[in-house]
Amino acid sequence: MTFDIYIPENLAFSDYIAVIQVARTWADAQDRKDPERFLATVAPEVTIDYSLLIPAWKSKVYTADEFVATWLAPDRVGLSVLATQHLLGMPYIKSATRDEIVVEFQEVASHGRRQDDDGAFGGKIGETADGRGWVEHRYVKIDGQWKIDLIKPSIIYMAGDWERVRRAEGAE
């Protein structure tokens, strides 16, 4: 059995750059806990499929506002003592049409629990949990702009205790 490498023949360089910019902004939005950046990246309706990573979260369709509120809540990346960095590696374009591009990125999702709880960047990290894997994004063109309408991570491995790192503030 062979693997056929997909080479998009109809992908304009400007669309490629736009998708990469949206992806980077999406990753930064999580790490900066920035709702405006998040809203700039997602379609009016976005599917989040965490079934391969955290099965209890399953796959769910959100409005853009619901997604941002959910993801920046204290039980997700909005926990003030949680420091994150989501690094996207080389993109693999799985399909490309005029109105839809599917990209799978290599991903390192680094999570650290601050020992101080002021929520400021920097500071001392006491516990960490880092995941390595891939994240698939589907981009759709809306009013001439590329937006993410599917986020589907998968994992190769996790180092550290993710559940412990993301526990509620004050919990031991």
Swiss-Prot record:
Keywords: Flavonoid biosynthesis, Lyase. Pathway: Secondary metabolite biosynthesis; flavonoid biosynthesis. One of its GO terms (biological process) is flavonoid biosynthetic process. The active site is at H86, H111. Its EC number is 4.2.1.-. One of its GO terms (molecular function) is lyase activity. It is an enzyme of class 4 (lyase). Disruption phenotype: Impairs the hydroxylation of the flavonoid skeleton at position C3. It comes from Aspergillus candidus. This is Dehydratase cfoI. Pfam families: Scytalone_dh (PF02982). Homotrimer. Each subunit contains an active site, located in the central part of the hydrophobic core of the monomer, which functions independently. The lineage of its organism: Eukaryota, Fungi, Dikarya, Ascomycota, Pezizomycotina.
